[in-house]
């Protein structure tokens, strides 16, 4: 079982699309895209994803990817 990274389709246009594309290439991650993750207020502010159900955001796609990997490393479950 790999870490689950969930993206909101509405947030992809806010900058998380590039992060999703980078993470999709990592065979050690399960990357999913959903219609809405119910984080509407935060969704409009910055790129974000849920990592194993926990909210992780960044100022841009590059920072989001860095923070996702840092979160996974700090919270190793597998």
UniProtKB/Swiss-Prot annotation:
One Pfam family here: DUF1450
InterPro entries: DUF1450, UPF0349
Family per similarity comment: Belongs to the UPF0349 family.
NCBIfam families with a match to the protein in the record: PRK13669.1
Protein name: UPF0349 protein BPUM_2879
């Amino acid at each position: 079982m790999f870490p689950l990274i969930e993206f909101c389709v509405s947030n992809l246009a806010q900058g998380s699309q590039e992060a999703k594309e980078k993470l999709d290439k990592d065979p050690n991650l399960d990357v999913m895209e959903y219609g809405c993750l119910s984080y509407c207020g935060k969704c409009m502010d910055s790129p974000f994803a849920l990592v194993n159900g926990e909210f992780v955001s960044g100022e841009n796609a590059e920072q989001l990817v860095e923070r996702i990997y840092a979160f996974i490393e700090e919270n190793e479950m597998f």
